[in-house]
Amino acid sequence: MFGSRNFGIEDVEECFMKKGYKYTYIDDTSYRDRVNRQIDAKFADSIEKGIEGEKYDCVFTFNYSPVISNNCKKINIPYISFVYDNPQIQLYSYTVINSCNYIFIFDKAQYMELKNGGINTVFYAPLAVNIDRMNRMLGTNGSCNDRYKSDVSFVGSMYNEKHNLFQRLEGVSEYTKGYLDAIIQAQRQVYGLFFLEDLLKDRILDDMLKNYPVEVNTDGVESVEYIYANYFLARELATEERYDIMKKLGTEFGKDYLINLYTPNGSLKIDGVMNKGPIDYYNEMPYVFNNSRINLNITLRSIKSGIPLRACLLYTSPSPRDS
C-alpha cells in the first residue's frame, strides 16, 4: 500500500487488519506523480521482498496514481485505487486503461463519463466510513468539549488561503473578469450540472492562458479548460458561496445561536460566526458533527454527484443534541 498520512489511511489499515490481510505500508507522497524513478525503485524493492515469505496479491492507493499503475502493469499485478478526491486530474491519464487497474470512483457522474468513454477499468463506489472507529470515539457522550458544541457548524476550507489560484488571473482584461464572474454566479444557481468547463472558449481562454498559462500533461487527455474550470473557477465559486452562506447565517442568527466555523484560515472574521480555526479531520471532526444540531455540507461544484465524506460521516454520527 502506497500513500501519505492523509485523512483515512488509518481506517484502511484497520480494515485490512480486521480482514486478516497482510500488507506493507510505504509512506511517500511522490506516488502521486505521473512518473517518478524513486517510486519505481521502492516498488521494485518491495515487490521483490514480498511479505512474510509470500508474494503480494495486489497494490492499493488512495486516489489514482499513474506511476503505480504502470509499475503494476509491468509485473501483471492488480492495482486497486480508491478515489476520494474531485477534481482528480490523474484519472485523465492514458494509464487508466491499463488492464491491471481496478479504479473505484465516488462521484457517479465522473464514473459514468469515463465508463461511457469506453474505460472498463473504472467502478462506482461511494465513500466508506469506519463505523467501528466512530462508535469507539463517540461512545456514550460523544465528547462534550465546548470546542465542538454548536447550533450550526461548517468544517472545511474557505479556499481563501494564500494559494488561491483564481487570484493569479488578476491580469486578465475587464471583459474577461466580468465574463468569469458572470459564469461563476450562474453556476452558483445550478446543482448537479457543472458547465464552467464548456464556457471557457476563444478570447476568454486566450486571455487566461496569456496571463496565467497552464500546461496539460503529455500522457493524458485533460484539457486546459478542465484545469481552469476545476482548479481555478470551482474553488473561487466555493470561496464566495461558503463565505456568503456563513455571513448570512451570522447576520440573521448569530445573536441567538452558536455558529462555528472550522477552517484552516483561522484569521478569517465573519460577524456572528465563531472561527475555531483548523481542526483535525481524523481525531476531532466526528466530535463536531456529533455535537452540532446542524452541520453544513457546502460541496465543491466540481463534485457533480458524489456524496462528500463529511456527509458520509454525518450518517454515522447521530447528534445527542437532536431535538
Show which residues each predicted segment covers.
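Nucleotide-sugar donor-binding catalytic core of glycosyltransferases
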Residues: 1-12, 117-304, 321
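N-terminal pre-catalytic "stem/leader" segment of glycosyltransferase-like enzymes
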Residues: 1-76, 227-232, 240, 258
